[in-house]
Amino acid sequence: MSQDTGLFSIKRPRESLAHFSALPQPSSALKRTSSIGAFGNPPTAQHTRMSLLNSASRPQQPNFQRSSSGGAFGADAGLSSVRRSVSSNIFHGASAGRQSYAPGSFSSNPASQNLQRRSSVFSRPSAGVGGAMGHQSFFTQVPNAAGVPRDPRPLRDRSFQARIGQELLEYLTHNNFELEMKHTLGQNTLRSPTQKDFNYIFQWLYHRIDPGYRFQKSMDAEVPPILKQLRYPYEKGITKSQIAAVGGQNWPTFLGMLHWLMQLAQMMDRFIMGEYDEACAEAGVDVSGDRIIFRFLTGAYHDWLQGGEDEDDETAGQRLVPHIEMMAQEFERGNEKYVQEVQALEAENRALRDQIEEMEKSAPDMAKLDKHFRILEDDKRKFEDYNQNVQGKIEKYENRIKFLEDELQKTEADLQAAEDERAGLQSSVDRQGITIQDIDRMNTERDRLQKILDDTMGRLEETHSRVMEKEKEASEKLEALEEVVKAYNTLGYQTSLIPSSAVNAKGQDYELSLNVNESNFSASQIGSAPSRISPEGDRLLAEPFTGYHPAHLLSLDLRGTVRSSLQTLRKDINERRKRAADDDLDRRNLLDNIKEAMDEKRSEVEALEHRRRAAEEEFERTKEITTTQKLASDAQIEKMEKELAKMRATMSESVQLMEQREMNTNIEYEQLTLRANALREELHTNVESMLNDVIRFKVHVQKGLEDYEGFVVDEVEQELGGDMVPADDIPPEEEL
């Protein structure tokens, strides 16, 4: 008696069953309201149980609404409000062989009455006033495409018909069709069947899919809705007239339909046997939990239906305890592999964490590695720049080497020409016959000219050294100018002045470049002997003997157009900077105001925090008082529970006495019913006798009136000399 009577109570919503199963409900679980729905209220938690003696038909079934996966047995599914609207028949054992005197009894078979008194979830009630959910199934309805689809199967092929017919016949034979339907099948049944054969085969196949369905109408009315619910692809090509005559040319179509039903039933059998569980697991769908819950629900509901009308909630809850324990054990067995996997993963995780810790301890300092990496990246970038510069110099030196080789070849050619000229001159001198005095005089003249040449070469060397210094200085200036131009272009890119499509360029080209001649001048171009001027100085010359003019060296007019444009841009930028500074000042003022508001709010929060602490202290005091009161209430409740247990024990004895009185009252009621029937028959006999007497009296009076009317007519004819007086002119007294 101390058990919680609310545990899995039948009369309260079962919130613990919500969202446990993804299995669709069978069509027999989608209950339709029977004809009793027109005379009474639906069985909900607010309505009490009704006895079979007061019902006009079999008890109304709970209306289980179709639900999607994940919410098959929620609080709204109708299971929580199921009420058993029948009473236990205490006279079933004593009077099992006679009909009940209850009004509205619809069956003389006690077994059928017992089945209809407590119907299972796997049965379907007859369609009545409330049968709005007729032909419901767990196959969802989907809109079909327009037109009649064409069946791609070769149903007109004799060999194909023989093959699927043999498969269907073997399936029927192996699954006890003849024993269940009490109908014999022959070898030619599926070649030239009768209408009865088709009806039995179709009903049996559909019962394999939905065992609780009951065929109540003709087949031409039952088959189309069933095919539509099963989503048979070619149900539009089957008409009611064809269903009424399945033989002849229509039989291949119906044979294909029966074969499709057989395949569907086989698929459901395989699903029930768990052949698709591995495929579901590979797809990431775990159906083991759904199977456990479905077995629990079916078993618990079946045991609950076995209870009597007077069974209380505690006993009903006790019926569910074994099923709950079994479900818990199955879940524990199913979760063992997951627990093992979790343990293995945890061990692997710990091992990996240990490895990470060891690697972190043995690894060098990441900051040093990052610093070293940045240094290497910087060195890499410098080496790449150096390689690019060296590559450019290599190309330039290759061009110079090629130029010098050409000059060397030309010089060798000139030397050879000079040697030839000297030999010619020597031979000419020999032919002329010059004397020794002439030779001395020419030598003296040569020495004088050589001395003059040496002085000239000295002055040339001095001039060349001064030229080299000037060339070096000019080269440094040129390189500095190139750096300045490069810096200018870089700043132009940064300030969106370069290229001409930039924002601040406004279509003008501000990119600066040097108009420097890259070619070298040879000695032949200069028109003299090989010059001692270095090749680096060739870039400083616009022409062989002319340098660059400052105005022509740069590609843009810096002091004119560029300077004015830059001043305009500078002015614009200063204005924008000024506006940005003003905006920044406004935002700083706004930020200061926000900080002041935050300080005020912070003070308010501190005040609220003080109030919260005071409220918490008040709450603690109230909690202590409430705890004390709760302890006193618990003691009072325990005392009342003990008194309630005593009252229940007393009530059990009273219930037994009331049951005995109910049995006596039922016996007296049946005796009174028999006496009332006998009295009714006696009264019917008396009423019939009285009616016969009244009828005879009426006939006698009518005959007397007719005789009197004839007598009056004769008397009137005699008095008036044979004239006929109309019956309408006879006075009322004479008529009577």
From Swiss-Prot:
Main subcellular localization, coarse class? nucleus
What task does this protein carry out? Acts as a component of the essential kinetochore-associated NDC80 complex, which is required for chromosome segregation and spindle checkpoint activity.
Q: Which UniProt keywords apply?
A: Cell cycle, Cell division, Centromere, Chromosome, Coiled coil, Kinetochore, Mitosis, Nucleus
Q: Which GO terms describe its cellular component?
A: Ndc80 complex; nucleus
Protein name stated in the entry = Probable kinetochore protein ndc80
Pfam families hit by this protein: Ndc80_HEC, NDC80_loop
Region described as Disordered: spans on this chain: 28-47, 53-72, 98-128
GO BP term (any one): cell division
What are the leading ranks of the lineage? Answer: Eukaryota, Fungi, Dikarya, Ascomycota, Pezizomycotina
Biased-composition ranges, Polar residues, are 53-66, 105-123
Location in the cell: Nucleus; Chromosome, Centromere, Kinetochore
Q: How does it assemble?
A: Component of the NDC80 complex, which consists of ndc80, nuf2, spc24 and spc25.
